[in-house]
């Protein structure tokens, strides 16, 4: 009698389905990777709601390009900036400041092979008629005051392109006692063109980068926000 009862109980235990065993490591990964949990009714509860943490709503800040025509003044100033920047980047008049062998590649830019005139780039001999200065070559200590004087005579807005390794940081003559280790110690530089000497294509690419910088200049908008 007792043996039959034990046999029936063991058969009942074997017939009962066992619960699914979830590894501890897998359960931890699932709780970390999931950003929301479901309650008993099936609704999605935000993470941290069970701990009583209030979730703050994210506030989207519109970019200047997404403002559209909400403000008439802002729209007018943005349009005016686009027109002025287009006119400036389409008529660059560089002030030639050739100091060494990099000036040969700068002169090569004006030849028919590249024809810089088709882009509105015309070399000027007077700093008062220029808006871009191309420092091409090695800048010595004796030439530094002249560079600064020519830069001060240029009207605003003005930009500077440092052409070549010598103008960027001294280059081959970096440890010489008579060489300025970079023309950015004398005048503020906007575009650096590497190379010894850089090719005319590299200088042309530097001019394109300067035009890109001009397109993103906020002239009247910065004045209006002051």
From Swiss-Prot:
SUPFAM superfamilies: HydA/Nqo6-like. Keywords: 4Fe-4S, Electron transport, Iron, Iron-sulfur, Metal-binding, Mitochondrion, NAD, Oxidoreductase, Respiratory chain, Transit peptide, Translocase, Transport, Ubiquinone. [4Fe-4S] cluster binds at residues 101-102, 166, 196. GO terms for cellular component: mitochondrion; respiratory chain complex I. Its main location: mitochondrion. GO terms for molecular function: 4 iron, 4 sulfur cluster binding; metal ion binding; NADH dehydrogenase (ubiquinone) activity; quinone binding. Pfam families: Oxidored_q6. Binds 1 [4Fe-4S] cluster. Its EC number is 7.1.1.2. It catalyses: a ubiquinone + NADH + 5 H(+)(in) = a ubiquinol + NAD(+) + 4 H(+)(out). Residues 40-68 are annotated as: Disordered. Its cofactor is [4Fe-4S] cluster. Gene3D superfamilies: 3.40.50.12280. PROSITE patterns: COMPLEX1_20K. It comes from the Eukaryota. Belongs to the complex I 20 kDa subunit family. PANTHER family: NADH DEHYDROGENASE, NADH DEHYDROGENASE [UBIQUINONE] IRON-SULFUR PROTEIN 7, MITOCHONDRIAL. This is NADH-ubiquinone oxidoreductase 19.3 kDa subunit, mitochondrial. It comes from Neurospora crassa (strain ATCC 24698 / 74-OR23-1A / CBS 708.71 / DSM 1257 / FGSC 987).
């Amino acid at each position: 009698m007792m043996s039959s009862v034990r046999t029936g109980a063991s058969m009942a235990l074997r017939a009962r389905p066992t619960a699914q065993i979830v590894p501890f490591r897998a359960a931890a990964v699932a709780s970390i990777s999931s950003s929301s949990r479901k309650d008993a009714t099936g609704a999605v509860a935000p993470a941290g709601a069970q701990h009583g943490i209030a979730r703050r709503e994210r506030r989207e800040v519109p970019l200047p390009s997404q403002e559209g025509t909400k403000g008439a003044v802002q729209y007018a100033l943005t349009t005016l900036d686009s027109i002025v920047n287009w006119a400036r980047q389409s008529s660059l008049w560089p002030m030639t400041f050739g100091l060494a062998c990099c000036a040969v590649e700068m002169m090569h830019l004006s030849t028919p092979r590249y024809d810089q005139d088709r882009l509105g780039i015309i070399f000027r001999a007077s700093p008062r008629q220029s808006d871009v200065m191309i420092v091409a070559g090695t800048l010595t200590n004796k030439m530094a005051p002249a560079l600064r004087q020519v830069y001060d005579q240029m009207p605003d807005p003005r930009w500077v392109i440092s052409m070549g390794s010598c103008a960027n940081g001294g280059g081959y003559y970096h440890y010489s006692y008579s060489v300025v280790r970079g023309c950015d110690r004398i005048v503020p530089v906007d575009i650096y063109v590497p190379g010894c000497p850089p090719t005319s294509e590299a200088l042309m690419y530097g001019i394109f980068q300067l035009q890109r910088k001009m397109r993103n200049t906020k002239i009247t908008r910065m004045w209006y926000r002051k």
